[in-house]
């Protein structure tokens, strides 16, 4: 069984825990209890492959930002979550993305942009804005509602597919001999 280490990041109160709990336990948590760090595991079948999802639900609060580097190092893919009714959380996505790229020392890290709370009538982040941001990053964008479960599986499963593509790309580049053990071309003298 293939294991995938997924990390859910985003500002405080955007619904990271609600999304994760909706996926894992099939219910909506409506009271807000700020997370420090929670880990969940779930076995699912995605595209015919049995997968073990190891999901790290992270703190959005700024006072826990020092912990971010550690979980970013171990994560293979990232759900970058903002709330469609919170423009600041949308603006913060770039900070999370830059930190992930810095910690992973790579511009090519599997990510999915997630606009949560799409069940709410008031929207301050336009869908078009979010699509444009995702396109500029070269990553998928999915709108979700942890409350109605809309898009929840799609978001996590899309991230697994992104990780699969990334793994295949890495495998193919190492098999064709263009990459050495240090990720550099090999030269024989």
Curated annotation (Swiss-Prot):
Q: Does the keyword Aminoacyl-tRNA synthetase apply?
A: no
SMART domains assigned: RAB, RAS, RHO
Looking at the keywords, is Endoplasmic reticulum present?
A: no
Enzyme Commission (EC) number? 3.6.5.2
Domain of life assignment:
Eukaryota
The listed locations are: Cell membrane; Golgi apparatus membrane
> How activity is regulated?
Alternates between an inactive form bound to GDP and an active form bound to GTP. Activated by a guanine nucleotide-exchange factor (GEF) and inactivated by a GTPase-activating protein (GAP).
Q: Which residues form the propeptide?
A: 187-189
What catalytic reaction does the record list? GTP + H2O = GDP + phosphate + H(+)
Assembly and partners are described as: Interacts (active GTP-bound form preferentially) with RGS14. Interacts (active GTP-bound form) with RASSF7. Interacts (active GTP-bound form) with both SHOC2 and PP1c (all isoforms) to form a tertiary complex; SHOC2 and PP1c preferably bind M-Ras/MRAS, but they also bind K-Ras/KRAS, N-Ras/NRAS and H-Ras/HRAS.
Protein name listed in UniProt: GTPase NRas
């Amino acid at each position: 069984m293939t294991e995938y280490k997924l990390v859910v990041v985003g500002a405080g109160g955007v619904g990271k825990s609600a999304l994760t709990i909706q996926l894992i336990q099939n219910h909506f948590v409506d009271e807000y209890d700020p997370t420090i760090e929670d880990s969940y595991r779930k076995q699912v079948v995605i595209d015919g492959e049995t997968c073990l999802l190891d999901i790290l639900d992270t703190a959005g609060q700024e006072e826990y930002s020092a912990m971010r580097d550690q979980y970013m190092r171990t994560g293979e893919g990232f759900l970058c979550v903002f709330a469609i009714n919170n423009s600041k959380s949308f603006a913060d996505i770039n900070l999370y993305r830059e930190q992930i790229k810095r910690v992973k020392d790579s511009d090519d890290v599997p990510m999915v942009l997630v606009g949560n709370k799409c069940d709410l009538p008031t929207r301050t982040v336009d869908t078009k804005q979010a699509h444009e941001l995702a396109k500029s990053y070269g990553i998928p964008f999915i709108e979700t509602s942890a409350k109605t479960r809309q898009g929840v599986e799609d978001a996590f499963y899309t991230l697994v597919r992104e990780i699969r593509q990334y793994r295949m790309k890495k495998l193919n580049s190492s098999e064709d001999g263009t990459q050495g053990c240090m990720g550099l071309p090999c030269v024989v003298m």
